[in-house]
């Protein structure tokens, strides 16, 4: 949402986080006045992330109507979300395990 943060700053953060292959979370990604923001965000992310990156949408978190959907970044670009949605964009290590998005920490601790 650009209610408290200017869109230009959000764009820059998306670009840098995408380039660094961070897992990204978008809160309040759309509203009646901001319908195209998720598609614009996806276009920025697609500069560095593959179309097949795993993404998720959770709607109405912790409410009775909670729902979730796992999809690719390519599919996310054309998906409708609203102000009750939270969008998660995985990184190259993110995978689906038992219908959940999982991103390993990237290292292993081996006791000696």
Model-derived regions, located:
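Class I SAM-dependent methyltransferase SAM-binding "motif I" and its flanking Rossmann-like core
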Residues: 1-23
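A contiguous loop/helix-start segment that scaffolds small-molecule binding in enzyme catalytic cores
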Residues: 19-112
């Amino acid at each position: 949402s650009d209610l408290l943060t200017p869109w230009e700053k959000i764009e820059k953060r998306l670009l840098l986080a995408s380039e660094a292959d961070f897992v990204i979370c978008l809160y309040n990604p759309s509203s009646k006045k901001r319908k195209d923001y998720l598609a614009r965000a996806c276009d920025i992310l697609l500069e560095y992330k593959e179309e097949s990156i795993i993404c998720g949408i959770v709607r109405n978190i912790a409410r009775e109507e909670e729902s979730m959907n796992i999809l690719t970044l390519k599919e996310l670009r054309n998906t409708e979300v609203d102000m009750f949605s939270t969008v998660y964009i995985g990184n190259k290590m993110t995978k689906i395990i038992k219908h959940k998005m999982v991103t390993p920490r990237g290292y292993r601790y081996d006791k000696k």
